[in-house]
Protein backbone atom coordinates (compact mmCIF):
# COMPACT_ATOMS: atom_id res chain seq x y z
CA UNK A 1 0.00 0.00 0.00
CA UNK A 2 1.31 3.47 -0.79
CA UNK A 3 0.33 7.15 -0.69
CA UNK A 4 1.84 9.79 -2.94
CA UNK A 5 2.19 13.52 -3.57
CA UNK A 6 3.85 15.01 -6.65
CA UNK A 7 5.87 18.17 -7.29
CA UNK A 8 8.76 17.45 -9.72
CA UNK A 9 10.98 14.86 -11.45
CA UNK A 10 12.52 13.16 -8.43
CA UNK A 11 10.94 11.31 -5.54
CA UNK A 12 11.53 9.75 -2.18
CA UNK A 13 9.97 6.42 -1.28
CA UNK A 14 9.78 6.27 2.46
CA UNK A 15 8.52 3.71 4.89
CA UNK A 16 9.49 1.46 7.74
CA UNK A 17 12.49 -0.83 7.34
CA UNK A 18 11.31 -3.92 5.47
CA UNK A 19 8.14 -2.23 4.14
CA UNK A 20 9.18 -2.92 0.53
CA UNK A 21 10.67 0.35 -0.72
CA UNK A 22 13.35 -1.40 -2.79
CA UNK A 23 10.81 -3.96 -4.02
CA UNK A 24 8.57 -1.15 -5.29
CA UNK A 25 11.53 0.40 -7.14
CA UNK A 26 12.41 -3.00 -8.66
CA UNK A 27 8.81 -3.52 -9.81
CA UNK A 28 8.81 -0.04 -11.34
CA UNK A 29 12.08 -0.83 -13.15
CA UNK A 30 10.47 -3.95 -14.65
CA UNK A 31 7.52 -1.88 -15.84
CA UNK A 32 9.86 0.61 -17.53
CA UNK A 33 11.87 -2.05 -19.34
CA UNK A 34 8.78 -4.05 -20.35
CA UNK A 35 7.08 -0.94 -21.74
CA UNK A 36 4.05 -1.38 -19.47
CA UNK A 37 1.00 0.49 -20.79
CA UNK A 38 0.64 2.57 -17.58
CA UNK A 39 4.16 4.04 -17.87
CA UNK A 40 4.28 7.54 -19.42
CA UNK A 41 6.04 7.55 -22.78
CA UNK A 42 8.71 9.94 -21.44
CA UNK A 43 9.83 7.20 -19.03
CA UNK A 44 9.59 4.14 -21.26
CA UNK A 45 12.72 2.02 -21.59
CA UNK A 46 14.69 4.05 -19.05
CA UNK A 47 16.97 2.04 -16.79
CA UNK A 48 17.03 2.31 -13.04
CA UNK A 49 20.43 2.01 -11.40
CA UNK A 50 20.15 1.13 -7.71
CA UNK A 51 23.06 2.28 -5.57
CA UNK A 52 23.23 1.55 -1.86
CA UNK A 53 24.35 4.61 0.11
CA UNK A 54 26.17 2.57 2.74
CA UNK A 55 28.16 0.76 0.02
CA UNK A 56 29.13 4.06 -1.60
CA UNK A 57 30.17 5.52 1.75
CA UNK A 58 32.28 2.47 2.58
CA UNK A 59 33.91 2.50 -0.88
CA UNK A 60 35.24 6.03 -0.37
CA UNK A 61 38.23 6.77 1.86
CA UNK A 62 36.83 10.09 3.07
CA UNK A 63 34.29 12.82 2.45
CA UNK A 64 36.22 14.35 -0.47
CA UNK A 65 36.53 10.99 -2.21
CA UNK A 66 32.84 10.27 -1.60
CA UNK A 67 31.83 13.63 -3.08
CA UNK A 68 34.00 12.92 -6.13
CA UNK A 69 32.49 9.44 -6.51
CA UNK A 70 28.90 10.69 -6.20
CA UNK A 71 29.62 13.59 -8.60
CA UNK A 72 31.01 11.14 -11.16
CA UNK A 73 27.95 8.89 -10.81
CA UNK A 74 25.58 11.85 -11.19
CA UNK A 75 27.46 13.12 -14.27
CA UNK A 76 27.47 9.70 -15.95
CA UNK A 77 23.76 9.26 -15.20
CA UNK A 78 22.96 12.68 -16.66
CA UNK A 79 25.04 12.11 -19.79
CA UNK A 80 23.42 8.75 -20.52
CA UNK A 81 19.97 10.44 -20.80
CA UNK A 82 18.07 7.20 -20.11
CA UNK A 83 18.99 6.56 -16.48
CA UNK A 84 16.93 7.00 -13.36
CA UNK A 85 19.27 6.87 -10.40
CA UNK A 86 18.00 5.21 -7.21
CA UNK A 87 19.92 5.93 -4.01
CA UNK A 88 18.91 3.26 -1.51
CA UNK A 89 19.20 4.21 2.18
CA UNK A 90 19.68 7.80 1.04
CA UNK A 91 19.20 9.18 4.55
CA UNK A 92 22.91 8.42 4.99
CA UNK A 93 23.66 11.21 2.48
CA UNK A 94 21.76 13.87 4.41
CA UNK A 95 23.01 13.57 7.97
CA UNK A 96 26.22 13.72 9.89
CA UNK A 97 27.36 10.97 12.19
CA UNK A 98 29.10 7.63 12.23
CA UNK A 99 28.57 5.84 8.92
CA UNK A 100 26.93 8.82 7.20
CA UNK A 101 27.85 12.10 5.53
CA UNK A 102 25.93 15.26 4.61
CA UNK A 103 25.92 15.66 0.83
CA UNK A 104 22.99 18.11 0.82
CA UNK A 105 25.07 20.82 -0.88
CA UNK A 106 25.90 18.40 -3.69
CA UNK A 107 22.51 16.73 -4.16
CA UNK A 108 20.05 19.59 -3.56
CA UNK A 109 21.04 21.70 -6.60
CA UNK A 110 20.68 18.63 -8.83
CA UNK A 111 17.28 17.80 -7.36
CA UNK A 112 16.14 21.43 -7.69
CA UNK A 113 17.29 21.70 -11.31
CA UNK A 114 15.38 18.55 -12.22
CA UNK A 115 17.76 17.57 -15.00
CA UNK A 116 18.26 14.09 -13.61
CA UNK A 117 15.55 11.79 -12.34
CA UNK A 118 16.46 10.43 -8.92
CA UNK A 119 14.62 8.07 -6.58
CA UNK A 120 15.66 8.13 -2.94
CA UNK A 121 14.62 5.42 -0.50
CA UNK A 122 14.57 6.36 3.17
CA UNK A 123 13.35 5.20 6.51
CA UNK A 124 10.24 7.29 7.37
CA UNK A 125 11.45 8.49 10.74
CA UNK A 126 14.84 9.56 9.43
CA UNK A 127 13.19 11.30 6.44
CA UNK A 128 10.97 13.33 8.77
CA UNK A 129 13.97 14.36 10.88
CA UNK A 130 15.98 15.33 7.80
CA UNK A 131 13.11 17.23 6.17
CA UNK A 132 12.57 19.23 9.36
CA UNK A 133 16.24 20.26 9.35
CA UNK A 134 16.32 20.75 5.58
CA UNK A 135 12.93 21.94 4.29
CA UNK A 136 14.32 22.37 0.76
CA UNK A 137 14.70 18.62 0.46
CA UNK A 138 11.04 18.02 1.24
CA UNK A 139 9.89 20.63 -1.30
CA UNK A 140 11.90 19.29 -4.27
CA UNK A 141 10.92 15.64 -3.85
CA UNK A 142 7.69 13.86 -4.64
CA UNK A 143 6.81 11.67 -1.69
CA UNK A 144 5.65 8.08 -1.94
CA UNK A 145 4.87 6.49 1.42
CA UNK A 146 5.17 2.71 1.42
CA UNK A 147 3.03 1.10 4.10
CA UNK A 148 3.85 -2.38 5.42
CA UNK A 149 1.84 -5.06 3.65
CA UNK A 150 -0.73 -7.22 5.36
CA UNK A 151 0.01 -10.95 5.79
CA UNK A 152 -2.28 -11.68 2.81
CA UNK A 153 -0.49 -9.11 0.62
CA UNK A 154 2.88 -10.53 1.68
CA UNK A 155 1.84 -14.04 0.60
CA UNK A 156 0.56 -12.69 -2.75
CA UNK A 157 3.80 -10.76 -3.32
CA UNK A 158 5.92 -13.80 -2.48
CA UNK A 159 3.83 -15.98 -4.81
CA UNK A 160 4.22 -13.45 -7.64
CA UNK A 161 7.98 -13.22 -7.05
CA UNK A 162 8.38 -17.00 -7.00
CA UNK A 163 6.45 -17.34 -10.26
CA UNK A 164 8.89 -14.90 -11.84
CA UNK A 165 11.84 -17.01 -10.71
CA UNK A 166 10.52 -20.27 -12.20
Question: Where do the model's predicted regions map?
Answer:
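Walker A/P-loop nucleotide-binding motif
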Residues: 7-27
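Loop/turn-to-beta-strand initiation segments
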Residues: 9, 46-48, 78-85, 113-120, ...
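Post-Walker A helix-loop "phosphate-sensing" segment adjacent to the P-loop in P-loop NTPases
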Residues: 30-45, 56-58
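Short glycine-rich substrate-engagement loop in P-loop NTPases that contacts/grips substrate
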Residues: 47-77
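Conserved ATPase-coupling elements of RecA-like P-loop NTPase cores
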Residues: 60-66, 80, 92-104, 129-132
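A short helix-turn-beta junction within AAA+ P-loop NTPase domains corresponding to the substrate/partner-engaging
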Residues: 108-109, 131-147
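Conserved AAA+ ATPase "SRH/arginine-finger" region at the nucleotide-binding site
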Residues: 114, 142-155
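Conserved AAA+ ATPase "sensor/coupling" helix adjacent to the nucleotide-binding pocket
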Residues: 156-166
Amino acid sequence: TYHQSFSGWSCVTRGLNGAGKSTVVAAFAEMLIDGHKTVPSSLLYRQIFLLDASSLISAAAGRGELEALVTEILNESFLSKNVILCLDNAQLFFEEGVGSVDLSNLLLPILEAGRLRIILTMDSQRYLQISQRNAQLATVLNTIVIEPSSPEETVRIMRDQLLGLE
